[in-house]
């Protein structure tokens, strides 16, 4: 597999768990084991949009028990002979090679994943990709000349990784308590985004836009505003 792989440094590693909540997008080449028309392929692909059941493949890092995952969209791109190119937006933890296998079963001919490229993880897209060579050059410029420009161009602020999460903004007087593990009380909240649901994971920010913590909402947006 090639494509987007976010790498976090120091305290920003805590943001990686938030990326699991924001979904991923892939472009995949699926090889069919028999001849099927493109119209039939498109019809079957559309049937996999929504909540699906998956058992992780034999080579996986988790227990092989059936679980549900969401497929937000599947787009048929093109087909050459028995090779189908499609893009898919899905919940984190979805196994695309297992998805290809299941699509092949639904088609009645069998199929396997031939190539896979991740084009988005949360807010990180291909447009923001950097190579290890880019990083090595940027580090050399900093180490040899003290020039931080290239490093700052490559490294996104921690707050960018949280940009797709619902946010709560708090008063400066509440920051220290939150940083020491205290619960956030209603008086400490300055602004809250809409569509927060109870039990959602939210990002807590200062009024200056600095990320402070990840938290679990005990109330919805409406519940917070009513208090």
Regions found by a protein language model. Name each.
Residues 1-136, 179:
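Non-catalytic RNA-recognition surface used by pseudouridine synthases
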């Amino acid at each position: 597999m090639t494509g987007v792989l976010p790498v976090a440094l120091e305290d920003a590693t805590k943001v990686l768990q938030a990326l699991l909540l924001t979904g991923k997008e892939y472009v995949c080449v699926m090889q069919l084991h028999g001849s099927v028309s493109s119209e039939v392929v498109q019809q079957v692909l559309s049937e996999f949009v929504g909540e699906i059941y998956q058992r992780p493949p034999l080579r996986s890092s988790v227990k092989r028990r059936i679980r549900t995952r969401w497929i937000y969209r599947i787009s048929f791109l093109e087909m050459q002979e028995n090779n189908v190119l499609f893009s898919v937006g899905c919940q984190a933890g979805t196994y695309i090679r297992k998805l290809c296998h299941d699509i092949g079963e639904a088609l009645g001919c069998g199929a396997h994943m031939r190539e896979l490229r991740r084009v988005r993880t949360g807010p990180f897209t291909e447009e923001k990709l950097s190579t290890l060579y880019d990083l090595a050059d940027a580090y050399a410029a900093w180490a040899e000349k003290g020039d931080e420009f290239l490093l700052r161009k490559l490294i996104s602020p921690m707050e960018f990784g949280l940009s797709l999460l619902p946010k709560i903004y708090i008063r400066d007087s509440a920051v220290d308590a939150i940083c020491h593990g205290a619960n956030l009380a209603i008086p400490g909240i300055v602004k809250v985004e809409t569509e927060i649901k109870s039990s959602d994971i939210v990002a807590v920010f200062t009024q200056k836009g600095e990320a402070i913590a990840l938290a679990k909402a005990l109330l919805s947006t409406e519940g917070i505003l009513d208090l």
